[in-house]
Amino acid sequence: MWRLLTRAPAPLWRMHFSDTWAALPTSAGLKTLLPVPTFENVSIPERSKLKFVERVPLVPKVRREPKNLKDIRGPSAEATDFTEGNFAILALGGGYLHWGHFEMMRLTINRFMDPKNMFAIWRVPAPFKPITRKGVGQRMGGGKGAIDHYVTPVKTGCLIVEMGGRCEFEEVKRVLNQVAHKLPFPAKAVSRKTLEKMHQNQKERELNNQNPWTFERIATANMFGIRKFLSPYDLTQKGRYWGKFYMPKRV
């Protein structure tokens, strides 16, 4: 015969707080909740939504330009840090933004965001670089073709759209990643903390690197005659940028 053993009641620990006794539950029921953000210092502008971007620049005459692929090569020197918002879309490669990409970002973000508690701003200019095309069936020669459309060149590390307001990163991360996957170059959603962490991780990898055979050492010492296959740009950027592509794992 099994003996029915009755469970002893859970003990209650009593502590004295300012001449009053309070019964505390056992440790299994304790929870630590993070404080709710107040957003006291956040100000929402009057026009909180993304503005419409013109398809053609408002100039009297546009000069036809060569390709100038250096516009999308290497790291960006503009729009690399946050200005007003706390969340943004970070470009992880170079490429060109067409007018359709601007409309896709504007419509997707404006439909999602609450204009009373959120705002979004552009960090890249409107399309200004002319791209020429020739008609189908034309013979070769005859000079440069007519202007077909305009694009905006973007480099690696440039912030494209910036968001902020009375919201957290988890609320806008899904929409920003949804927009980033539709862009013509690699991109992802970042916040101020994640962007700083990315820069810190890159510096730590450079300081704590245990592999002595780095790209910079091999190229500087001209091992195996590699200098004849490299350009001065490769020596400056230490091989991290190959045209419009960015290789973050290379130290």
UniProtKB/Swiss-Prot annotation:
Protein keywords: Mitochondrion, Ribonucleoprotein, Ribosomal protein, Transit peptide
Transit peptide: 1-29
Statement: the UniProt record of this protein carries the keyword Transport: no
Location of the protein in the cell: Mitochondrion
Main location: mitochondrion
Pfam families hit by this protein: Ribosomal_L16 (PF00252)
One GO MF term: rRNA binding
InterPro entries on file: Ribosomal_uL16, Ribosomal_uL16_bact-type, Ribosomal_uL16_dom, Ribosomal_uL16_sf
GO cellular component, one term: mitochondrial large ribosomal subunit
Top-level taxon of origin: Eukaryota
One GO process term, biological-process aspect: mitochondrial translation
Family, per entry: Belongs to the universal ribosomal protein uL16 family.
Quaternary state and interactors: Component of the mitochondrial ribosome large subunit (39S) which comprises a 16S rRNA and about 50 distinct proteins.
Name of the protein described by the UniProt record: Large ribosomal subunit protein uL16m
Lineage, opening ranks: Eukaryota, Metazoa, Chordata, Craniata, Vertebrata
